[in-house]
């Protein structure tokens, strides 16, 4: 009898913990309109689940996009995204940080569609002071079109880290002392769905099949974990304080375990690295030896 009572009480406790966690997750979901605003393709954007989810769509007439109301100088930015299914060659779904102007800074996640049955590419890139050309591509180890997956960008004074489902896949370190520019301008968080058929799939050889339009991508997770800064400023260094958790020593470099996990992912799933592209860069860019 005591054993039965114990089992019943244990199940009851676990149930209460589950429901409490579920409620906490519900309270943590932020409405899109709190931190973001639609910037283009207004008639191609649909708010779902009481504003907790946004669907971007693209047809022959237009794509769509949104951006954060605030500018940031550092932070940890995440978005849950489900990509367009079926034949999406030429279609680009994006999630990135960017400043404005010819000498802009930018930190990119771009998801490059493909023919049905072929893998979508996860492309990352870093622009600093207008200089990009730092593409690295990965094949996801899951189907990004059937469910939501979390994509994250850590940006602090020490490093930029790209995450997929909390797994680090790329690091770009701040090595300004070695003459390599590092993103330091106030940036906004941007998401978009657009026509990239001139370059996105097989170098632009595979064009969009409009018979599959409208293409749709869903976004969730509109919380705000960044240091707000004046968008008119050219300096985000005011956001380097360790009073922000993402700037503390813990996040100044990957742990030994994170480094090992990242190396494993890169060995198995990275399909292109600008640092290894000798026809393009006969001499590898100087930051490459620091970011392996």
From Swiss-Prot:
Signal peptide region: 1-24
GO biological process entries: cell wall biogenesis; cell wall organization; xyloglucan metabolic process
InterPro entries membership: Beta-glucanase/XTH, Beta_glucanase, ConA-like_dom_sf, GH16, XET_C, XTH
Enzyme Commission number, as recorded: 2.4.1.207
Positions annotated to bind xyloglucan: 110, 123-125, 133-135, 198-199, 203, 280
Subcellular location: Secreted, Cell wall; Secreted, Extracellular space, Apoplast
Disulfide feature: 227-239, 275-288
Regions that span the bilayer: none
CDD domains per record: GH16_XET
Single annotated GO MF: polysaccharide binding
Cross-referenced Pfam families: Glyco_hydro_16, XET_C
Keywords: Apoplast, Cell wall, Cell wall biogenesis/degradation, Disulfide bond, Glycosidase, Hydrolase, Secreted, Signal, Transferase
Post-translational modification: Contains at least one intrachain disulfide bond essential for its enzymatic activity.
Gene Ontology CC: apoplast
Superkingdom of the organism of origin: Eukaryota
Domain GH16 per the UniProt entry, residue ranges: 25-219
Site features described as Important for catalytic activity, chain residue numbers: 108
Catalytic activity: breaks a beta-(1->4) bond in the backbone of a xyloglucan and transfers the xyloglucanyl segment on to O-4 of the non-reducing terminal glucose residue of an acceptor, which can be a xyloglucan or an oligosaccharide of xyloglucan
Known role: May catalyze xyloglucan endohydrolysis (XEH) and/or endotransglycosylation (XET). Cleaves and religates xyloglucan polymers, an essential constituent of the primary cell wall, and thereby participates in cell wall construction of growing tissues.
Stated family: Belongs to the glycosyl hydrolase 16 family. XTH group 1 subfamily.
Protein's UniProt name: Xyloglucan endotransglucosylase/hydrolase protein 2
Organism: Arabidopsis thaliana (Mouse-ear cress)
Source lineage: Eukaryota, Viridiplantae, Streptophyta, Embryophyta, Tracheophyta
Gene name, Swiss-Prot/TrEMBL: XTH2
């Amino acid at each position: 009898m005591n054993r039965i009572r114990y089992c019943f009480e244990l199940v009851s406790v676990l149930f209460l913990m589950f429901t409490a966690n579920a409620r906490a997750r519900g309270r943590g979901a932020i409405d899109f309109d709190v931190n973001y605003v639609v910037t283009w393709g207004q008639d191609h954007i649909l708010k779902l689940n009481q504003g907790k989810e946004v669907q971007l769509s693209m047809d022959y007439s237009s794509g769509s996009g949104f951006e954060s109301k605030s500018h940031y100088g550092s932070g940890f930015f995440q978005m849950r995204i489900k990509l367009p299914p079926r034949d999406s060659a030429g279609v680009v779904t994006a999630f990135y940080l960017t400043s404005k102007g010819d000498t802009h800074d930018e930190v990119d996640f771009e998801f490059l569609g493909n023919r049905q049955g072929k893998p979508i590419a996860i492309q990352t890139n870093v622009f600093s002071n207008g200089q990009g050309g730092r593409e690295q591509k990965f094949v996801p180890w899951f189907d990004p079109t059937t469910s939501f997956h979390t994509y994250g960008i850590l940006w602090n004074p020490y490093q930029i880290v790209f995450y997929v489902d909390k797994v680090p896949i790329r690091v770009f370190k701040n090595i300004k002392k070695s003459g390599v520019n590092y993103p330091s301008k106030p940036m906004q968080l941007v998401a978009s769905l657009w026509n990239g058929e001139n370059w996105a799939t097989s170098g632009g050889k595979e064009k969009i099949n409009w018979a599959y339009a409208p293409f749709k991508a869903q976004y969730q997770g509109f919380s705000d974990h960044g240091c707000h800064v004046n968008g008119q400023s050219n300096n985000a260094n005011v956001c380097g304080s360790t009073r922000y958790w993402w700037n503390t020593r813990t996040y100044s470099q990957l742990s030994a375990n994170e480094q090992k996990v990242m190396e494993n992912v890169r060995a198995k799933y990275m399909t292109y690295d600008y640092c290894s592209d000798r026809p393009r860069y006969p001499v590898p860019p100087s930051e490459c030896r620091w970011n392996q």
